[in-house]
A protein has these predicted regions:
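Single conserved hydrophobic/aromatic residue that forms the stacking wall/gate
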Residues: 1-11
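Short, low-complexity export/processing leader segments characterized by acidic and small residues
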Residues: 11-13, 81
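Acidic, turn-prone loop/beta-hairpin segments
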Residues: 21-112, 119-134, 157, 163-168, ...
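Extended, charged helical/alpha-beta scaffold domains that provide interaction surfaces
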Residues: 127-153
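C-terminal edge-of-domain segments
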Residues: 145-177
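Short cysteine-rich clusters marking metal-coordination/redox-active sites
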Residues: 178-181, 189-192
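Short functional micro-motifs and their immediate structural scaffolds
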Residues: 183-186, 197
Length: 197
């Protein structure tokens, strides 16, 4: 029914193909002390706690077993806990609209990247370099994002458009592939070098 479709949309579309995908690099390659990585771990813990509680009535023993491994409270059973309290300030319609628009830009970029992959010009998206040519409203949406991480490419830049609402140019990234993070960079990968020291 509707509940099943909503769960699938949440887990498959929002988490698996979006959040988990763009955060893999941070989790695997950033320093264990990196603020970005620590914030990501906090979010993943909130997601895990919420999903465990959500599935507890259906997957009684499985959720109990997982809970016993990750339990940080004094409660012996997940079934004795309340649902995770989500702060009221997290319900933010402006932020929701912003991310909805960002998601649409990402979908457009994914289509452009997939065309290059289908034509065998690149293998994975990390072999790509993208340029986003956007009108002012969309251009400003990307201001505080690490574009290469968000689009899962080796290099990303944006340019203000005078005509097109959105235009995305994709080409093969130039440089050497970092053996650790797999990004193709013109210089030695500073992040990975620092982490390995």
């Amino acid at each position: 029914g509707i509940g099943r479709r909503q769960r699938q949309m949440c887990i498959r579309d929002s988490l698996s193909s979006f959040y988990f995908d763009i955060r893999k690099d941070v989790l695997y390659c950033d320093s264990i002390n990196s603020k970005k990585r620590k914030n990501c771990v906090i979010v993943l813990n909130i997601i895990l706690e919420s999903l465990l509680k959500w599935f507890a009535p259906i997957l009684v023993f499985t959720t109990e077993e997982i809970y016993s491994l990750v339990n940080k409270s004094n409660s012996e059973s997940i079934h004795e806990n309340n649902f995770v309290k989500i702060p009221a300030q997290w319900k933010n319609e402006k932020l929701n609209e912003k991310w909805s628009n960002l998601f649409k830009i990402k979908q457009e970029a994914n289509i452009a990247i997939e065309e290059k992959r289908a034509n065998k010009e690149i293998g994975s998206s990390l072999e790509a370099e993208i340029k986003l040519i956007l009108k002012k409203d969309k251009f400003e949406l990307l201001d505080k994002l690490d574009l290469a991480d968000y689009f899962i490419v080796s290099k990303a830049e944006k340019e203000l458009s005078k005509n097109d609402d959105i235009k995305i140019e994709v080409k093969k990234a130039q440089g050497q592939k970092c053996e650790r993070c797999w990004k193709i960079l013109e210089k030695k990968c500073e992040r990975c070098s620092k982490v390995l020291q």
